[in-house]
Amino acid sequence: MLYRELDRAFLTFAAIATFTGLLALSIIDGATHRVPRYITGLMIVSAVPLIVIDALVHVDITELLRGFAGAVALFLLYSLIGILSRGGFGRGDVMLSPSIGILLAYRGWDDLVRGTVYSFVLAGVLSAVMLALGQLGRRDHIAFVPYIAVGTLLAVLI
């Protein structure tokens, strides 16, 4: 009986931990252009065990493996972007990616792809608008974590 009431509670708690971290990081990144590692670390150590427990409760190891593969894939993508952008994409964003990758890929590959695309499209569109309005220069850096947060939230909710 209790099992049915808590059917996806562990996944829900993992999502809450992730979004709480994303909210804090969005505020910090927006104000300082810094992404503290201790918060990204807390996100990983709080969300990953809950996702593992959810996979064990539902006896579906393939979801868990997909989640870990998604964490690695997003980390590699963000790392590549960080290298190619020569500092335009921060290490904090790269270090945040496994937390987002495991949560979204655990839910499904489509969530991972949508969350990633939403993040970059939102950042691109809003940056273009700010450039057009003169609020942002071509060489200015933007805080990317808020876009990651909104993109991830949209992928989970839609």
Task: Give a label for each model feature.
Residues 18-24:
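Central hydrophobic cores of alpha-helical transmembrane segments in multi-pass inner-membrane proteins
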Residues 128-154:
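Interfacial loop-to-transmembrane junctions
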